């Protein structure tokens, strides 16, 4: 990543929901380099579901970017009750706990819930009780985060579906890939998922925010999805997690 000097315009690469998918993470980071991203931000859920949690944590730490806690990160270190997880998510959380090194657990335990930058904020799930990992899936959910937002812009993840809400009257939303954010309308942008997309597009997904021109682009990256799915099966994780990865749902 290019790095920035004081007062310079910045291209941010904002990504999350990696879910132990190292192949997808590598593809996203390579695309960020290609797209001249200056600074990366990770919205959490580095682990869970996928077969390479340790490698994903190592890579995120190596980048040295701002990183937030996701619910699966907390589940993997015993900071979140997994009884309400579905069966496959529970199995993956238990498997992930055993796969982590002590330094991985320490890192995941050190992550915060919200980060405020000069003209935007980032969170894993919702600004409405960020430590509860609530979802922003509906206009009602979005309204709660707008109430808590004191910046023009929020980036979030958690649902694995790129969806943008605009604080217009009435509220509007879009799934467009090109999002204008510089006109003063407060905006919530879901950046999609690197490692387990759920909008029926299996490509790795993240956002590029160019603060100089006031634009966000939801960016998709091809990678070897089948290889990542085979790693899930080889690790002894539920086969359903591999199948859904290839289907993007």
Feature names for model-found ranges:
Residues 1-65:
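N-terminal active-site segment of His-dependent metallophosphoesterases
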């Amino acid at each position: 990543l290019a790095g920035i000097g004081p007062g310079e315009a910045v291209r941010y690469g904002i990504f999350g929901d990696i879910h132990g998918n190292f192949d997808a993470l590598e593809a996203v980071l390579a695309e960020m380099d290609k797209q001249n991203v200056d600074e990366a931000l990770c919205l959490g859920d580095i682990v869970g579901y996928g077969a390479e949690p340790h490698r994903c944590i190592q890579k995120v730490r190596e980048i040295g970017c701002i990183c937030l806690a996701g619910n699966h990160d907390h589940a993997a270190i015993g900071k979140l009750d997994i009884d309400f997880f579905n069966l496959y998510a529970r199995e993956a959380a238990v498997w992930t706990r055993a796969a982590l090194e002590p330094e991985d657990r320490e890192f995941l335990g050190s992550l915060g819930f919200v980060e405020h930058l000069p003209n935007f904020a980032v969170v894993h799930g919702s600004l409405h009780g960020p430590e509860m990992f609530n979802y922003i899936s509906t206009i009602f959910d979005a309204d709660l985060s707008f109430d808590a937002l004191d910046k023009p812009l929020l980036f979030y993840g958690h649902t694995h579906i790129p969806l943008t809400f605009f604080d217009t009257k009435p509220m509007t939303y879009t799934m467009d890939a090109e999002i204008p954010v510089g006109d003063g309308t407060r905006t919530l942008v879901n950046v999609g998922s690197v490692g387990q997309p759920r909008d029926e597009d299996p490509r790795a997904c993240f956002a590029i925010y160019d603060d100089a021109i006031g634009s966000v682009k939801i960016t998709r990256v091809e990678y070897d999805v089948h290889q990542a799915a085979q790693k899930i099966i080889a690790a002894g994780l539920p086969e359903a997690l591999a199948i859904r990865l290839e289907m993007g749902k």
